[in-house]
Design a protein with these regions (language model features):
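Feature responds to low-complexity, polar/acidic, surface-exposed segments characteristic
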Residues: 2-46, 54, 59-107, 114-135, ...
């Protein structure tokens, strides 16, 4: 039951990938979605984002901004997955030259790599600040849930501009 609840929450958040509902701002956490000045409680995403904030999956860009019209980055998705699954063991990610120890997401990327949900875009680049595509996001979720995604039917994604 808990796995289904986690899956539902992650899928709701992932469905909002056109939003930046940021996972960053490690030092400031809104208590509820309506604490963000740019949160529209009548928007189509309101229920899912409210649940994600209430459950500690989304923190926002700051204590007052969630940026619902921006892109979600690969680092932000890593943070959401780590918070969803309670990852605590980090990998050595020193080979990724674009992941600085001074960035808020350094530990989240290391946790996601150790969990097996993330790979670099190359042997030396993780691209944590790049927008995450739907395909990448769903691959991360499938890996986190240890799904055998090769056994599922393939769907034509040509209608989506962010397909990869």
């Amino acid at each position: 039951m808990k796995k289904k609840r986690i899956l539902a929450m992650i899928l709701a958040v992932a469905s909002c990938l056109s939003l930046a509902v940021s996972a960053s701002a490690a030092n400031t956490v809104a208590r509820k979605a309506t604490d963000f000045r740019d949160f529209d409680k009548s928007a189509w995403y309101a229920e899912a984002v409210s649940a994600a904030v209430d459950n500690g999956l989304l923190y926002g860009k700051s204590s007052t901004i969630i940026d619902p019209n921006g892109d979600m980055t690969r680092a932000e998705m890593a943070a959401i997955i780590n918070r969803s699954f309670g990852c605590y063991k980090a990998a050595d990610i020193s080979q990724y030259k674009d992941v600085s120890k001074s960035k808020w997401y350094y530990n989240d990327v290391a946790l996601a790599v150790q969990m097996g949900t993330y790979n670099g875009r190359s042997s030396s680049a993780m691209a944590p600040d790049s927008p995450i595509t739907r395909q990448e996001a769903m691959t991360v979720v499938a890996r986190a849930l240890e799904l055998d995604y090769d056994s599922y039917s393939k769907t034509d994604l040509s209608a989506f501009s962010d397909r990869s």
